[in-house]
Amino acid sequence: MSDIKDTVKRLMAMRDLDEIFALEDDTDFATALSSALCDWTNYGEHLDLLSPEAQVFYLCDQLDNEINSDGFVSFIFERYGQWAPETVDALETIGAPQTADILRRAIAMLPDGVCPRDYTQRNDLLFEDEDKYYTAYNALDEEFYAYPDGTLTDLYVTYARDHRDCFSAPEK
């Protein structure tokens, strides 16, 4: 167990992109690149510091992590919901149109079909009708878990590797 912890710690501490992109194992690569991008953007707070291609990886990775952790309720109503429309575009970009459609339907369930950028506004919506959102989003979670476009991680890792020259550490 200690070896696994040490490996994860090592991957999450990597910041050299040449070293990260040299990783052969896709899971190791995704872990290391995700950690670096989270660090460089303060968990998305400064997403604009990343290239459009790095943003695509970041948004798809965060969606994948959130849905597999706590489902669409977590993604929409927590931090990353503010980028829900951009995440739809990112999914299309990596070749995941069916997953993009699932997210589009999650957004469409919100009033006026709009996911507010503001965290408090999103949470107010959730607390107004918690049962409705949990029930509806649980059904979408199941669709997501079927990976209709294939494993999402494979798609965004392939995309990142294909666009290596577009990834760089932001200027300090």
Please state what every model-predicted region is.
Residues S2-Y58, D64-S69, V73-F77, G81-A84, ...:
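Extended, alpha-helix-rich binding/interface surfaces that flank or overlap catalytic cores
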